[in-house]
Amino acid sequence: MKILTVANHIAILEELEKELSAVSPGSEIIRETDALMAGKYAFNHEVDIVFAEADMKRMNGLQLIQFVRHKHPDVKSFLIGTDEDLSGFWGGVSEDVTGILTYPFIKKTIRDTLRKNGL
């Protein structure tokens, strides 16, 4: 499984990668701090899952997810962020978004979220 993780800060990506590696060993995890570069990567490569920070520079997480799903309609996609970052998305999340994860990431929460979505 190929997982694309996108966030402004490398520390967030490292934490997410650590938890994803524990939950889904053997998955290839691609980290990117630039949403536009992540979109370019997804346009040129097959990805199975995208975790995108809601509040990013140049392009927000929802815009990135919509861009990726245009190329890969079956990709599973998750917005990540703090409760405050995600407050604008509660109750109004686009059908493009599979789910939402809040910081701090907890292995059990990630595992339950992936299982709930058939992954």
Identify what each model region corresponds to.
Residues 57:
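The feature encodes the CheY-like receiver
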Residues 31-49:
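Acidic, metal-coordinating helix/loop segments flanking the phosphotransfer/catalytic sites
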Residues 10-30:
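Two-component/phosphorelay signaling modules centered on CheY-like receiver
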Residues 40, 62-73:
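Short amphipathic alpha-helix used as the core "switch/output" element in two-component signaling
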Residues 105-114:
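C-terminal output helix
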Residues 34, 60-63:
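Acidic catalytic/metal-coordinating carboxylates
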Residues 1-12, 16-17, 50:
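Conserved acidic segment of CheY-like receiver
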Residues 83-99:
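Alpha4 helix (beta4-alpha4-beta5 surface) of REC/receiver domains from two-component response regulators
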